[in-house]
Amino acid sequence: MLIGRSPVRISFGGGGTDLPSYYEQFGGLVLSTAINKYFYTILGNRSDGRIQVISSDLRLFGNWSDLAALPALPAQSSGLEIPLAVLKDLGADLAADLFLASEIPPGTGLGSSASVCVNLLKVLTTHLRCSLSKYELAERAFNITRFGLKRHVGKQDEYAAAFGGLNYIRFGKDGSTQVEPLQLDAGVLSALQSNLMLFFTGAAHHSWDILAAQEESTRLPGGPAVEALHQVKEAAALMKEALLCGNLEHFGHLLDDAWRAKKSISSRISSSRIDHLYGVARESGALGGKITGAGGGGFLLIYAEPACQNSVRSAMQNEGVQEMAFAFDSQGAQVIVNDPFIDHDEHAGTRWTFLPLSSAAAV
């Protein structure tokens, strides 16, 4: 048996510049961190040659006689399209039960779809003894979603899930990606984590249609979306410098600047409800914030110093919005249990192994 997990992420700045329509013209960059809300895959060996996939979150399952019997990838979301796409991409004969579960609901703007894909790839390639570096893992997951499922997605989510940690990620015009882990003073990192708050707006969504419209407008030379994305990218670079200097107050104000720029990319990124909630948080003392992900719903990220947090929390509770506690994740995608004795799976390893959560995976 194999058990793997991968984190979701919160993005501070640069979102949208990780789309090919932008970075192929100008180069993109994103500042983000992985958090300790995880997607899990449990793989158990089968002796009958069949493949079974069960999603506990979506309450869906599929059972097929072998790889050749897998259905064609659906044009629209069916709930199991990501595991199907990963299995087809690997193209390897295997007989396994795959049980999928997560700590957060889908469509909440935290990059959960990318985390699903990265996690499945990590577990299945471990099972098949096909080692992938973190870069290879992230890039392959992106290609599966972008080209296999034909979804309008950027690259940042896959890299956040694969690497973990607080990263400054650059996307080159040539399609290359560079991940720079930010080495912050321990006190600064702890204060940053403490000053961030997440509130669920209650609106789950799929971001692909928003991103599709954004890509179309980004390819128009000199359009308003392009200028807004330039501002978002510049804000991300300034946020990095603020963190490295330990100037968290400036970081909070930059979040506000970046959010205002991001809203001008598309009218669908925010809503009257989101604007109202953000205004309530700001009136309660928050310095900045943003909707996580492409927009349209999901989690509202707020930056508030300790003296203001109770006021922000109380105001948001009065609005019927639930807070989700979290911490930063530094590990990224990993196999946390590799036990060949549970189901006599000789592919799982030559001996029982438990990988401590504190161990760092190799790049």
PLM-predicted stretches and their roles:
Residues 87-108, 140:
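Glycine- and acidic-rich phosphate- and metal-coordinating loops
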Residues 1-13, 17-19, 24, 30-33, ...:
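C-terminal nucleotide
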Residues 39-40, 105:
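Histidine-centered metal-chelating micro-motifs
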Residues 69-77, 107-114, 131:
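Short gly/ser-rich anion-binding loops that grip negatively charged ligand groups
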Residues 110-134:
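DPxDG-like acidic metal-binding loop motif
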Residues 297:
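Glycine-rich active-site/cofactor-binding loop and its immediate structural neighborhood
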